[in-house]
Amino acid sequence: MYLYHYFDATTGPFRNLSDLPPEEAKSVLTDIRVKRPNSQPAKRHDKCVEYRRNCERMVRTEFAKKGGLIKRLSPHYLVVEHSPWLSTWYENCVCIKIPVWEFDLRTVSFTYGDSMPTFSPTVDDDKEYRKQVYTYDEILEIIDRYGLPQDWNDDGKYGPERYIEAQVWSNETIDMYLSEYQRSVVGGA
């Protein structure tokens, strides 16, 4: 299994609005709307950072209850396997692909679908994976049961789940790939 991180090449990987103070996050979002109006992040509503932080709190709490190791307040976001839909989100989209075994799996939680709709009070369809956080072993069982959402719902026709989100609650493996990416950008310039 591979985890993919999609991002805009002009800003770089593993940049999370939740890592910023609220006013700075709003400023960055405004800047995205002005400079990259055709990107998916430009379409986010004004309260998206507030909603995202609340969602992260719920995911973090549920993962900790399962014995997950939390080494960051906000996770790094990746998805399980390639998502054709996510690859269209950014004007200059690139991705980093990381084998799941390179992570300490005690620091990785999963939601079947993006965590925002998974934990949204407005999505109430009684599917077993709503409002659920999974460990690696648990998500493998869910994948065995339902498959990968991008294989049966990449267009979102059957609900909000279009991919499996992986939340990485540490920097160790991420820092290694971030350094490698930065070296490749500097070396390629």
Regions found by a protein language model. Name each.
Residues 1-2, 8-42, 72-74, 83-189:
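Conserved NAD+-utilizing ADP-ribose enzyme module
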Residues 77-79:
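Short hydrophobic beta-strand that contains or immediately precedes a catalytic carboxylate
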Residues 34-70:
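Short N-terminal edge-element motif at the start of the domain
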